[in-house]
């Protein structure tokens, strides 16, 4: 079987699909990952073969407009949701023609796409092959389903297809049920296996007094890419430096210079995937990105989240509703608020209990290898169980 995985050029959306892609490869199937040229090097870094399609689009510019308040002299732009949907249709338009040609020439049997890569189901419909959606977090687009036919209508017309199901024949869902919202198509649960990119195992930490909590602070990669002022990892570390905790900062080399002065004893881990750092931690302070959130939950860690982008806000809200942490709106995340939230979560066993409950749910879902037979069934024209 030939399985074509599709994402637009955003690394975290790719990373969510890597474990299932490798499970398919290990089962003997041919796997290819298609995305815009900008992501080619990142795909190759996963060990999977890449196929560039379409042209690059400056998605960061749209997210930057959403995340940063407009100058007082400018009119406030449209809400973030419509602008994001407009961006996603632009990305689909940039990729779809090349993706259809690639799928035809490569003779794809199945397309697996991340939920915001509409080029995936569009190409599948044009090629007459099934498509399966692969979530990277909570199902953010299920609530937007009624808007998608109109948004994708012009692309369907261009491809000569009557309509497209943007949710696919089924949805691979790595979220534990206690975190997820209702899914827009048949749900195929799959265990979340953290893949946070390649990296080095950090040196063992120095010995600390028994019972002293270790707090990991990370701000992902998106916000520093949009604007250095949105990267709050250094501020968060300084905010909690006065507590009786050890602080571990997880950053990229490019982010190291954005941290500023740090409290004495703060450890900084560069280029270390979060899943290698999480096992020794007691709490994660972060920005609310899905990859960070799910990786922390995979280790049963409660979280303090300061989300800013719309998807981060919605992922974080679900974590807060599940009781596995505290969410601080970005505009209210003063240093003392972060410090108090961290102290409160560490002192409350209820947050850790909720995180542990979600961890058990997550580990109770089938491993990536366990969903490969379902994908084989869908590719053969069957209905998943």
Feature roles, as predicted:
Residues 105-107, 167, 279-280:
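Alpha-helix C-terminal capping/helix-to-coil transition sites in glycosyltransferase folds
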């Amino acid at each position: 079987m030939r399985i074509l995985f599709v994402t637009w050029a955003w690394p975290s959306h790719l990373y969510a699909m890597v474990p299932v892609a490798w499970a398919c490869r290990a089962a003997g199937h041919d796997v290819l990952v298609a995305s815009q040229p900008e992501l080619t090097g990142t795909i190759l870094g996963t060990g999977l073969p890449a196929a560039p399609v379409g042209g690059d689009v400056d998605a960061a510019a749209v997210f930057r407009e959403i995340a940063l308040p407009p100058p007082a002299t400018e009119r406030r732009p449209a809400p973030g949701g419509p602008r994001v949907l407009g961006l996603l249709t632009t990305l689909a338009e940039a990729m779809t023609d090349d993706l259809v040609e690639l799928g035809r020439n490569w003779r794809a049997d199945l397309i697996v796409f991340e939920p915001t890569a509409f080029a995936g189901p569009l190409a599948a419909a044009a090629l007459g092959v099934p498509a399966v959606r692969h979530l990277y977090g909570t199902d953010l687009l299920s609530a937007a389903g009624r808007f998608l036919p109109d948004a994708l209508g012009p692309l369907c017309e261009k491809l000569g297809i009557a309509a497209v199901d943007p949710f696919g024949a089924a949805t691979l869902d790595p979220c534990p049920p206690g975190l997820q919202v209702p899914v827009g198509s048949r749900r195929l649960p799959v265990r979340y296996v953290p893949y946070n990119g390649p990296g080095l195992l950090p040196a063992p930490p120095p010995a600390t007094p028994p019972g002293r909590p270790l707090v990991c602070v990370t701000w992902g990669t998106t916000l520093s890419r949009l604007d250095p002022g949105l990267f709050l990892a250094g501020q968060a570390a300084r905010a909690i430096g006065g507590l009786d905790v050890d602080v571990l900062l997880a950053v990229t080399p490019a982010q190291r210079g954005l941290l500023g002065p740090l409290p004495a004893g703060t450890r900084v881990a560069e280029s270390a995937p979060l899943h290698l750092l999480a096992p020794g931690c007691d709490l994660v302070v972060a920005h609310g990105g899905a990859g960070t959130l799910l990786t922390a939950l995979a280790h049963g860690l409660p979280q303090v989240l300061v989300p800013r982008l719309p998807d981060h806000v919605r992922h974080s809200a679900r974590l807060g509703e599940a009781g596995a942490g505290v969410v601080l709106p970005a505009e209210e995340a003063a240093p003392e608020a972060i410090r108090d939230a961290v102290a409160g979560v560490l002192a409350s066993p209820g947050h850790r209990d909720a995180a542990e409950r979600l961890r058990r749910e997550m580990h109770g879902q089938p491993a990536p290898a366990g969903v490969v037979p379902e994908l084989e069934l869908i590719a053969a024209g069957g209905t998943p169980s």
